[in-house]
């Protein structure tokens, strides 16, 4: 009996040994651990954004569905998520809030090729084009389907028009996951805009949010920083992307670089470089941020609005980025037969930040924006 059972005992022992060996090697090969410099580290959990699930150390691109509404307009938001191998903050970069602001969109095409999720800490969400209907429709300011400005539509509505539903998706799906947020713009298809600048709310969101937003604005590395005034008593009042974000307690900045629908590296590279600099500042990639040594800070802006519909004739001697004095002629508006209706002059001395550069003009269009600063360079307010 014993003799007859011995081969079976040996066989059972060998089977158990083989089974343990298989289990061991399966665990070694497929368990979520990394061994680095003698340390064993548990990989962190995957990052989830709507239907996307991104394992640590990987990059995934996908389309975030914008729920359909009564208008019958369907759309999506193209995103790329880098979920770094190591823990860290979540930074969201949003391009294409306005469909004809191309510099941010092209920059967000280039940035992913410069990053390796295996060498990153934290998580980066790139919104390639927030407002796809406006991009596809080649429209400025407004969505072609509902004629609404996405950057005046936050926090959005789940059952609203397509622009309101895009705002709602960004508010409900992107913002709650974000520790920091950057809304990247350029001058629209009709606007000349120079110099490139970063901007933050200097009064909204509380002291810590203001301080961290200022940190982002400086880390972006541009030579000019604009301080937005004002705060918001409710989320419904915070109709701008970054205003909604800071009112929710998320440090945020705007960036402006580019103009007139032009694709030019002189505008695109500062966005890409600035994003990398912020990633370094937040410890998400290796290296030190590259910041401006003494950036100009603009704390007050003066705006000029058109009083008439007609044709805008920009003064040929005036260029954005130049210093203008109060009373400088910026251009004239004529009717469709050439009769002069309005001479537009600078309402304050300062840097001409934005100026219409194409002929169409409507009543109450914001033709020009001036960053009000004293004429003497020695008296300009600068970051210390």
Give residue ranges: language-model regions.
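Structured catalytic-domain cores with a bias toward divalent-metal coordination
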Residues: 2-6, 13-15, 36-384
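N-terminal signal peptide c-region/cleavage motif recognized by signal peptidases
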Residues: 31-33
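Sec-dependent signal peptide recognition
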Residues: 19-28
